[in-house]
Regions:
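Ligand-binding "clamshell"
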Residues: 38-39, 152-163
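Gly/Pro-rich hinge or "lid" segments in bacterial periplasmic/extracellular proteins
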Residues: 61-115, 119, 129
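Aromatic- and charge-enriched surface segment that lines or borders ligand/interaction sites
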Residues: 1-32, 181-183
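Structural transition elements
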Residues: 211-227
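Surface-exposed binding/hinge segments that line
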Residues: 3, 35-77, 97
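Ligand-site clamp/hinge motif
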Residues: 109-153
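Periplasmic-binding protein-like
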Residues: 160-175, 219-220
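Alpha-helical secondary-structure segments
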Residues: 17-23, 49-50, 90, 117-119, ...
Length: 227
């Protein structure tokens, strides 16, 4: 059972109750194969602000799956043919041009306080050099996903870096099929010990990362000494 926050509305004006969330998830399951495979949701019941979800098999990580970007809760009745959806966040999309930009204005009825910025324009810039030049010239005020080789241009008092460890990682998959040498734990250990993770971070990532000992970063609830 999931109990939803009271007094939350979509930007369309519709109340975000269990029925609205149920409708959104039903649409998701019908149109997104990975979501259906991940969650194994079999049925749902809506009662006021309480949504009861039944799965076809035990799914202890269900909430984590629903936290995936595909699990964003929107007002399905409001439509999305123009690329704009009605959500419950601090900003409302007013213009969406795929591959070019997204314009957002602050949601005056946001349930968790008043946003500090009146309007945002998020631009799509796929070329790394173009992105770096846009930030240097002041064409954009912030950039995400900057190429590592561009970092030195911004290592001064005019710019601030914001970084955080995430579960996005580079990893090696081993073949566990019958007959594979990787079914031997000693072989797997030897392969793992032979990977220079520190060298990978320093040379391939130019120091912008850290050697991982699992899927989750040390600072997370499931990382480091916590497991």
């Amino acid at each position: 059972k999931i109990t939803l926050q009271d007094n939350v509305t979509f930007s369309s004006g519709r109340a975000m109750d269990a029925e609205a969330v149920k409708q959104c998830l039903e649409h998701l399951l019908a149109n997104h194969d990975r979501a259906a495979a991940d969650t194994k949701i079999d049925s749902m019941e809506a009662d006021g602000q309480v949504l009861t979800i039944h799965t076809s098999e035990p799914k202890p990580a269900l909430l984590n799956y629903l936290g995936d970007p595909y699990g964003c809760i929107i007002d399905v009745d409001a439509g999305f043919d123009d690329g704009i959806v009605a959500g419950t966040g601090p900003y409302i999309a007013t213009d969406c041009q795929s591959g070019d930009h997204l314009t957002l204005v602050k949601n005056e009825n946001y349930w968790n306080g008043t946003p500090h910025i009146d309007e945002l324009t998020i631009k799509t810039i796929t070329d790394g050099n173009t992105l770096a030049n846009a930030l240097l010239s002041g064409e954009v005020q912030a950039a995400y996903g900057m190429a590592y080789e561009s970092y030195p241009m911004f290592e001064n008092d005019n710019f601030t870096f914001s970084q955080i460890s995430t579960s996005r990682c580079f990893f090696l998959k081993m073949n566990f099929n019958e007959g594979s040498v990787c079914t031997d734990p000693a072989v797997r250990k030897a392969i793992a010990m032979g990977i220079d993770k520190e060298g990978f971070v320093e040379n391939l990532l130019e120091g912008n990362g850290y050697p991982a000992n699992g899927t989750f970063p040390a600072g997370s609830a499931f990382g480091g000494d916590k497991v």
